[in-house]
């Protein structure tokens, strides 16, 4: 039997006992989706502050070519950093569009980068399985091979040398 609260990110013994969480996913922010971007900034200004913890469960961005490209998402980075600087907790999970989102971006926003393995957290006595969802595409072996490659630490160190 699993414990009721499990670690949510690699490398620490921290567990997530949630007080007042909100979960968002699949925003696919890009310069070409201005209405979605406006809705995100409105959410960050008016709604997110009502919650103690914000979980972004993947695909915050339409695409992410690496943490060295963080300048592309400057206003988003600032909004997330302001949220975490206010004393709230920000958690970030990679999706299938932003799987190269990494520790540098998490540090820039004050976020905890969630482990690639699907974590379980507890809120109000209820266990919640956190997942972007792409790992459940088990009938697509080509995608699963691509996903495994993109999340392989050895491959990621060579990623800037790769041609997409």
Predicted regions located by residue number:
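Histidine-centered catalytic micro-motifs
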Residues: 24-29, 130-136
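Hydrophobic, well-structured mid-protein blocks that either form specific transmembrane helices
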Residues: 114-120, 124-135, 141
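Core catalytic region of metal-dependent phosphoesterases/phosphodiesterases
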Residues: 8-9, 14-24, 29-123
